[in-house]
């Protein structure tokens, strides 16, 4: 059984990106817009800021109080985009905001998360687009271990617009036979997948009976269980019991998470290189 080590691969990619950035006369500018002060968001933001520092890009954090109006928030995003090469809005947003509307205020040329509707439209129509970071990270992780995607049954548990659907689309474009499951209607049939990707947001949802022998399981879930100093992070897969049945599995933490972060910076560098070409 192989552990799909996203942390190890992301470090290899970090070295590659750092070497690229060192060759630039000016440095890419990466901006995070955060509304509120959610504890879990602060943790994820620190990870991204640390990675930016490691790679050598300029990082900026714009913290905004929850009391801001939607109109003013959009204005800030539009202004910050003008002085950034890549910008993300840290999710989740407070409930009073229209998440789609806020994400769509990020210009498509700066949308390194790949979550705006304009970028999604290009993705689903097969046009040139920024690959959504999580989906890109998963494909890169599977390819690193030389597993075949073409003609394989790739099933996705979870149908969210931000994660599940983009994952399904990218694997479809890579030549896989794709299928998705909505957890509200059950996951019966998931045990037929050659590659099972779980992005449901439900801890330990997938048990050994839900996976095929010698299959590949990718756990996208990040669930915090417990309180304060006793809090642990677990995925959507019952890792300790499923790992004995499969060919390869990604752990939580240390699997998809680091790959999502490094994919943001891959997208940033690609956007920045286009900017340099257009500027010449």
Swiss-Prot record:
GO terms for molecular function: methenyltetrahydrofolate cyclohydrolase activity; methylenetetrahydrofolate dehydrogenase (NADP+) activity. The keyword Mitochondrion does not apply. Keywords: Amino-acid biosynthesis, Histidine biosynthesis, Hydrolase, Methionine biosynthesis, Multifunctional enzyme, NADP, One-carbon metabolism, Oxidoreductase, Purine biosynthesis. GO terms for cellular component: cytosol. InterPro entries: Aminoacid_DH-like_N_sf, NAD(P)-bd_dom_sf, THF_DH/CycHdrlase, THF_DH/CycHdrlase_cat_dom, THF_DH/CycHdrlase_CS, THF_DH/CycHdrlase_NAD-bd_dom. HAMAP family: THF_DHG_CYH. Catalyzes the oxidation of 5,10-methylenetetrahydrofolate to 5,10-methenyltetrahydrofolate and then the hydrolysis of 5,10-methenyltetrahydrofolate to 10-formyltetrahydrofolate. This is Bifunctional protein FolD. It comes from Mycoplasma mobile (strain ATCC 43663 / 163K / NCTC 11711) (Mesomycoplasma mobile). The lineage of its organism: Bacteria, Bacillati, Mycoplasmatota, Mycoplasmoidales, Metamycoplasmataceae.
């Amino acid at each position: 059984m192989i552990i799909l080590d996203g942390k190890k691969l992301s470090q290899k990619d970090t070295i590659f990106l750092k070497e690229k950035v060192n060759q630039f006369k000016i440095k890419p500018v990466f901006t995070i817009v955060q509304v509120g002060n959610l504890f879990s968001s602060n943790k994820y933001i620190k990870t991204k800021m640390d990675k930016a520092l490691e790679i050598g890009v300029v990082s900026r954090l714009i913290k905004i109080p929850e009391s801001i109006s939607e109109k003013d928030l959009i204005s800030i995003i539009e202004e910050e985009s003008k002085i950034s090469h890549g910008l993300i809005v840290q999710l989740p947003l407070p409930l009073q905001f229209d998440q789609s509307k806020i994400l769509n205020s990020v210009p498509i040329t700066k949308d390194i998360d790949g979550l705006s509707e304009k970028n999604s439209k290009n993705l689903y129509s097969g046009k040139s687009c920024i690959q959504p970071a999580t989906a890109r990270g998963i494909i890169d992780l599977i390819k690193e271990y030389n597993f075949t995607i073409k003609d394989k049954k790739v099933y996705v548990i979870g149908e969210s617009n931000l994660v599940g659907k983009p994952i399904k689309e990218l694997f479809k474009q890579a030549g896989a036979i794709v299928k998705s499951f909505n957890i509200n209607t059950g996951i019966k049939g998931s045990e037929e997948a050659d590659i099972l990707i779980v992005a449901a947001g439900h801890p330990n949802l997938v048990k050994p009976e839900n996976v095929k022998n010698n299959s590949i399981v990718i756990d996208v879930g990040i669930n915090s269980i417990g309180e304060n100093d006793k809090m642990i992070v677990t995925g959507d897969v019952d890792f300790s019991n499923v790992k004995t049945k499969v060919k390869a599995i990604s752990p939580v933490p240390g699997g998809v998470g680091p790959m999502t972060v490094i994919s943001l910076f891959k997208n940033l560098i690609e956007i920045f290189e286009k900017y340099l070409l257009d500027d010449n």
